[in-house]
Amino acid sequence: MRPFWREVRAWLQASTGWPVQCPGTAHPLHAFRWMVSKPVYNNNRGGTSAGWTIKLGDSPVIGTAIHSGSDVGRACQSLMCIPDPDRQREEDPFTEHFIADFPTQIIVHRSRFQVDLNRAREAAVYRSPDQSWGLNVWREPPAEEFVNESLAFHDAFYGELKRVLADVEKRYGRFVLVDVHSYNHRREGPKAVPASQDGAPDINIGTSSMDRARWAPVVDAFMEALRGRRFNGEPIDVRENVLFQGKGEQTRFVHANFPETGCAIAVEFKKIFMDEWSGKPDWGAIERLRAMLASTVPVLEAAVRGMT
């Protein structure tokens, strides 16, 4: 085994408690997929792909895309009655591309329809249509064994997130987590008039779960950097707490566990980068939004360093 991977394996095993093998060895990671300078792949039991990918970088700025995944696995798929197009329309496809230039990235591959990591544990498995945009998800109520397995995934993710953030905190003192999502604005149908711009900004910044005054230098600098950019020839519309207020579980978790040192900013991109009904992406738009978000990384790093 090369010395580099020996060090990586030792660090992963110490931080997670999981047995780990390195690329080129006989067995893959036993638990989840990681990227640490190089990707390490895994297939979990039941045919599901790896739960998430983490790429660790040298920066106090972290980008996450926890709703980008669409994997439900064969076992879960057999329990579902929701058509794939309906399910995928409520996921956040392509958001992993928006954080591709972030030093540290956390990307979840599991669909929110199996377990929603941005909801509190007790609401993380959708049990009724009122939890899932009026959509019927299951052929019949999921068995408690299945629910418990899904909640174990929720627990494992937040346990790992806490370890990663604690390490970043130890190294830099403070950190910023940019929690990237997307939202639909043509809910009445593919040919319907889109939602009014007044209530549907291109980028909605959610800050309600943070100490807004404390983190004003960071959030204000972030929003100013975004507002200085143009999209399709027009200034990008960036507003705070309009359609979403940043009340998801991930931002709450960060501020509850790192109240003095962690700033989690919820960022909702309107799906102006794709056809939300067909699922077809506009790769040019995705690349422009990716570059826009990438431009905020040095701004956030400077803002964090400047806090006293």
Predicted regions, residues:
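N-terminal catalytic or cofactor-binding beta/alpha core of small enzyme domains
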Residues: 32-308
